[in-house]
Amino acid sequence: MRHRNGLRKLNRTSSHRLAMFRNLTNSLLEHEIIKTTLPKAKELRRVVEPVITLGKNPSLAGKRLAFDRLRNRDNVIKIFSELGPRYQNRNGGYIRILKCGFRRGDNAPMAIVELLDRPEAGIISNDSAD
């Protein structure tokens, strides 16, 4: 019986799935917003949130665990210097998944995954216009 086995296999081998979620996690942490399919986005939440939670308590063991899961030194530094303090008062729920229609080629449901409380990009201030 398959009781409480909630892992989505996504038609991939375990090594391919691990590499795919590692790449998606690194992209999300680097750009703070990505577009992917809805099942990948829902499964990505289970990978990203524990990694960000590691950044809330800066320790050497936590940094080693984060590097083991990400294999990207720049993103590990970002987790512990930026994201950990940003989400210090939030107990989980660090990402937002928004449905954004269907992919043109195969009609797969798409989603936008973004980190909450991210700084707004592309806003031009009019302070120096005078």
Curated annotation (Swiss-Prot):
Keywords: Ribonucleoprotein, Ribosomal protein. The keyword Ribonucleoprotein applies. GO terms for cellular component: cytosolic large ribosomal subunit. SUPFAM superfamilies: Prokaryotic ribosomal protein L17. The keyword DNA damage does not apply. Gene3D superfamilies: Ribosomal protein L17. Pfam families: Ribosomal_L17. One of its GO terms (molecular function) is structural constituent of ribosome. GO terms for biological process: translation. Belongs to the bacterial ribosomal protein bL17 family. Part of the 50S ribosomal subunit. Contacts protein L32. HAMAP family: Ribosomal_bL17. This is Large ribosomal subunit protein bL17. It comes from Nitrosomonas europaea (strain ATCC 19718 / CIP 103999 / KCTC 2705 / NBRC 14298).
